[in-house]
């Protein structure tokens, strides 16, 4: 056959496939832009601004629509009503974890974030129970955060008001809180292993949040054959896993079953009990991945939020002035802030909430997956279909938060200046897969930020109006730009 004819027939077949598949292949899936064979909607999504692309699609196809990631459909939920209906009202059906190949390659179905089914339920139950035993939601954890806040102040005072990059210091504070829960002890801010841990977590989050890395998630076959930052991500994970397995071994050698010291001890004790959960994976590798998940969630999320907060507080000095006035009035300068203060500090509480709303730290959270064939609204979503939840569409809803692109603590204040809660405040997602450490993160942000503002004047090296708060990447997590500043003791 003539090569030209073959080429034309091939092109016709591909065109036919692309037009036919959405109508017959999708069945009752929600509507969406027409995908191309093999690559899906890849070229229709701006990888540098996925949030805006999702918003644009919602204007055409509504709050529930379908995008094709490669050849696989992904249902997108846009807006508060769609997310609430799926994650809360149909929580069990939408409680699966979607596939993220670059993360799955290291997690291997283990840990908290990327396990599935009964193993995930057992792992989550153990984690929640153990964190409560270790003081989560109680004064025990608050004491740890307050103590770390004092160390944070000491470390910032060492800068003597000179220009500094706050990235590592802001990572060390929440990092030590997590270490005290998992490994019993905190670390000195100059400890080499500790700094290495913080650095590798920071670097890993930047890598998996970069636009380029999403190509490997869409076409995972490339992971084993192409060079790229994903290899650094794998290397960092290998180091962290080895470090944690070494710590676990030390715990085994010094374990006292009658006196558990930390998260690792509780795991080691339970794995040897006769009535242990049959669905729980009690291997040490599973424990190492669990702890890795806690490090990633507990360090970088809080660290990035605090760095964004510092940028915003310098950019909007009138907000900082109001917060410091409230600190002087309620707390003063001679005692440490505590969580009881929060109810008497509506503006400070509003500021902390507004920082989280404005920066949108996890624009789409982690992918969900339906655990069974699911009827949702007028659509049919087959078991195993990935579900993307646009948290941005809720946190930046213009009806709930007028002028959502403006940083304004007034979004969380009523007409009398009292703190105003909002159901649309879901930076930690919602439903069965929401972040386990939400209460700890909120506590850390309030106590760390109020302690910093109680003790320091924040000084930018550039004019406030020139401060850039745009994330350097935001595919998975919003990462703040690198900057320097001065902490001037008050």
Curated annotation (Swiss-Prot):
Top enzyme class: oxidoreductase
Reported effect, residue 180 to C: In G- phenotype
Consequence of substituting residue 369 to D: In G- phenotype
GO biological process, one term: xenobiotic metabolic process
Membrane topology of the entry: Peripheral membrane protein
Matching InterPro entries: Cyt_P450, Cyt_P450_CS, Cyt_P450_E_grp-I, Cyt_P450_sf, Cytochrome_P450_fam2
Tissue: Liver, and to a lesser extent in prostate, kidney, heart and brain.
Assigned keywords, A-Z: Endoplasmic reticulum, Heme, Iron, Membrane, Metal-binding, Microsome, Monooxygenase, Oxidoreductase
Outcome (variant: residue 338 to S): In G- phenotype
Keyword Membrane: yes
GO MF term (any one): heme binding
Induction context: P450 can be induced to high levels in liver and other tissues by various foreign compounds, including drugs, pesticides, and carcinogens.
Compartments in which it is found: Endoplasmic reticulum membrane; Microsome membrane
Binding-site list for heme: 435
Cofactor: heme
The keyword Nucleotidyltransferase appears for this protein: no
GO cellular component, one term: intracellular membrane-bounded organelle
Outcome reported for the amino acid change (mutating residue 237 to Y): In G- phenotype
UniProt effect for mutating residue 22 to L: In G- phenotype
Enzyme Commission no: 1.14.14.1
Other facts: The G(-) form of this protein is thought to be unexpressed.
Role description: Cytochromes P450 are a group of heme-thiolate monooxygenases. In liver microsomes, this enzyme is involved in an NADPH-dependent electron transport pathway. It oxidizes a variety of structurally unrelated compounds, including steroids, fatty acids, and xenobiotics.
Name used for this protein in its record: Cytochrome P450 2C13, male-specific
